[in-house]
């Protein structure tokens, strides 16, 4: 039998043993992921590379602290330091987006969205958002998601000719459907949305306007994308896409919704907040107020436009590759492969061979199943965070265009990717297994 003293010593040893010694299997998997991120080009539109300071905050001792409630009104003792952190995160979020209210506790975007719907509608009420098949999100009413199970759903779609939103048709549909909540925002739509028009429609039919800006929040923070905050009753977002912060969610709103939203997050959706993630959000919101952040967002936009222009070239057109809507206003390009020899899965696999990570994505009116799809969603945020400039983005765009045009020399394209990855190193100085 182990004596109490020996047990205590053993526990102390475990608590001070580095990850590589305590769990080499997990350490090696993390090391492998870091090597993958360093040696490939990350172009999944919902991914980014966080600053090292965000890694440090999220990997801190704050993971030990339970803090149910809100600053000054906790259900646990010892919250004096996490109160400071949450206040910083809330205040900075309000400053960045010009919002009256912020809740920074949602664990993820889906939890933020669930809390928004809980605040604005009752189960069985009607909500109206962009169809998932046309670029919306699961939480905007998809039938297998909580939003599709708890609420009656009316979905609007893009125009079949232009693949853009037709606000006149959305208005007609809203008048006919009379939703309690009108939803703007998207997960795969490459153009600006008219938030003022959405608000006008919502007011006309007596609906609340909720905008999910998860994908384009970083561009909004940098004043490079129209802000939904002045128009919407409530705005939700993730923090890890264009914002480049930790994987988590956040809610912004007019002050009149503060009490309902706070209650819907806690105790409505969650128990204790993840204070290490809240700290990482605070850091991300500080970063979002800098000139360097704005420059990064500018390069994100420029990179996406360079990519769209290259994919509109004659060789890709001849191969049946089409840029949906002809271009982009945001950080991503939607590629339609319906007329090419590739489906979405094959396109994703082909670029993976080259060393570029993207995701297959359904296009509007897609004839293929969701696990195959007829499209690709390609984003530029992570590469902008890595430091790529106009010249480098032009090279990346040409690699992608050449690959999708067909009959490319995969080894030669991979060599070009390797050079770009070497020219723009990631997390220099981090040991393979060490996170901070």
Swiss-Prot record:
CDD domains (UniProt xref): SHMT
Site positions for Plays an important role in substrate specificity: 240
GO MF: glycine hydroxymethyltransferase activity; pyridoxal phosphate binding
Highest taxon, organism lineage: Bacteria
Biochemical pathway: One-carbon metabolism; tetrahydrofolate interconversion; Amino-acid biosynthesis; glycine biosynthesis; glycine from L-serine: step 1/1
Key words, A-Z: Amino-acid biosynthesis, Cytoplasm, One-carbon metabolism, Pyridoxal phosphate, Transferase
UniProt cofactor(s): pyridoxal 5'-phosphate
Catalytic activity: (6R)-5,10-methylene-5,6,7,8-tetrahydrofolate + glycine + H2O = (6S)-5,6,7,8-tetrahydrofolate + L-serine
Primary location recorded for the protein, binned into one broad class: cytoplasm
Feature: compositional bias, Low complexity: 1-18
Pfam families documented for this protein: SHMT (PF00464)
Residue positions binding (6S)-5,6,7,8-tetrahydrofolate: 132, 136-138
UniProt-annotated stretches for the region Disordered: 1-22
Modified residues annotated as N6-(pyridoxal phosphate)lysine in this record: 241
HAMAP family, sorted: SHMT
Oligomer status and interactors: Homodimer.
Function of the protein: Catalyzes the reversible interconversion of serine and glycine with tetrahydrofolate (THF) serving as the one-carbon carrier. This reaction serves as the major source of one-carbon groups required for the biosynthesis of purines, thymidylate, methionine, and other important biomolecules. Also exhibits THF-independent aldolase activity toward beta-hydroxyamino acids, producing glycine and aldehydes, via a retro-aldol mechanism.
Family affiliation: Belongs to the SHMT family.
Protein name per Swiss-Prot or TrEMBL: Serine hydroxymethyltransferase
